[in-house]
Amino acid sequence: PYLNQWLSLNPAVPGSWELEVDRVRDFVRDRVSWMDAMLSYGKVRQVNGIYQLASGMDLCIFSQIVNEGGETNAKAVLVSDIDMAVYGEDFKPIGTMSNSFAGSLDGQGHTIRNLHISGGDAMGLIGYAGFCSLSNIVFDETCSVEGKNNVGMLVGAARNGTVTISGVEN
C-alpha cells in the first residue's frame, strides 16, 4: 500500500495514514505520562519530608526544587553514590541569589562523581548558601568547578547566615 491510501490496521481508526499516526501518538503520549507518574519520573522520593537523592537526575531535580520552586529550607540525603556524567549541562548549583539554600544536605558518606560546574558567580554544588548544613559529602577527583567570583567545589557563596560544614571530603 501507498502512504496516501485509505488503509488501517486498527479498526478504531478507519482512514488515512495520518489519522493512524495521530492515534498512535495520542496512545504513546498518554501511556508515557501514565508510566512517568507511576515511576515518579521527574519527582524525588521523600521519606518524612526529607528528599532521598539516588541519582544524578534526583540531584538536578532537587536543585530545581530549591532554585525554581523556592523550597529553600528543603532537607535531602544522598542514598547512593551519584554519577553526574550524563547530567553535566542539566545541573545548576543548588541555591540562587534570590533563593539561597537554607536547608540541609547529608551525603551519608556517598561519593559524587563527574560533577563539572562552570559559569559566572557563585559556582559550586551549592551556589548561594545561607543558614544551611552540609555534611558527609565526598567528591572524587573527576569533579571540577570553574567560575568568575565566589567559586568552590562545595559552596560558591555564603550569604545571610551561618553555613555548617562537617565531614566533607575530596
Model regions: which residues?
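C-terminal catalytic region of ATP-dependent kinase domains
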Residues: P1-L39
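Surface-exposed repetitive/solenoidal architectures
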Residues: V21, R25, S33-N170
